[in-house]
């Protein structure tokens, strides 16, 4: 039999260690991971914009970094329904960023062809792929908590 402790201010029992139904730590951990991965993606794009990627693409990379920062803050700061909205938007943002890179690597995007040997492309592929998976889990957890499942 697992020991339980009272969830902080929730009035519901929480499993020790936060795993299991009713635990409050698990969604917070996933929200934190989501925020870190959003910041990593934004950081990669900002680095590229400041170190050689110029023109319209450089401006889009700066906007990507700003969007990632805003979404990372929203993921950790919001609760209830606004958190669900932020989580879904973050997932769409991450999927869109990954899709744009994959398109640039394959058929080209807006006349830009990318190669795997370009600066940080393999890193971006890994971070964006992991970020997509983490955000799917985060969004599912937030949705389940919202429904009370």
Model-derived segments and their meaning:
Residues 2-149:
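Membrane-interface extramembranous regions
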